[in-house]
Amino acid sequence: MRALPIALGSGAMIMMVGLGLSSARPQTANTLRSVTEFSTIGDDKERAIALFNEAGKVILNPRCVNCHPAGDRPRQGDDGHPHQPLVVRGMGGFGAIGMHCTTCHGPENFDPGRVPGHPLWHLAPIEMAWVDKSLGEICEQIKDPKRNGGKSLDEIVHHMGEDSLVGWGWHPGAGRAPVPGTQQEFGALIKAWVEAGADCPPP
């Protein structure tokens, strides 16, 4: 068994624990390991942590973290700088009165202006803030119904693997790099993590 550092798009580092990784496919910043590559890890807790660490390549990516701010302003860019122009969370995360998110963000990306879009464009609730948190802290938060929108783990699997706003991260439009892998691969990692016991990396 060995631990390998994996660089995330956000600049953070996590430790991937695995067996026989020399036979695994080469990894780049834009790929995710398949669930089957973790099947040699016999201990459920160790496998769950390894799976969530891999899913963390998506979770800690700026495409995701920027919409999970700890304050009232969304973030932008790979460096996570405050949104320009100045906008605030507002009621329900949809922006202030007279300056709703959909004032500028349409139902789809507007590539000429590099403006991202989705029919339900909005911020995650502040209880779901990820900015400045470790992957382990986010993991515990994702499991906590008081901080995940009241979702069960099965609903989390569905949300991560099928929600179209989550899926925007793989289709972010001009000027933005997508999150690694595919939403199907990401959803499979989250499902396998839950099935292995949903243990979290250390904070």
What positions do the PLM features span?
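Detector for methionine-enriched segments
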Residues: 1, 13-16, 91, 99, ...
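Post-cleavage N-terminal segment of exported redox proteins
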Residues: 2-50, 62-66, 70-75, 192-203
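Residue-identity detector for glutamine
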Residues: 27, 76, 84, 141, ...
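Electrostatic cytochrome c docking/interface patches
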Residues: 37-58, 74, 78-94
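C-type cytochrome heme-c attachment and multiheme electron-transfer modules
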Residues: 46, 53, 62, 109, ...
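The canonical Cys-X-X-Cys-His
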Residues: 63-71, 98-108
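Short, solvent-exposed loop/turn and secondary-structure capping segments
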Residues: 68-70, 76-80, 112-117
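Short C-terminal domain-edge/linker segments immediately following a structured domain
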Residues: 88, 97-98, 133
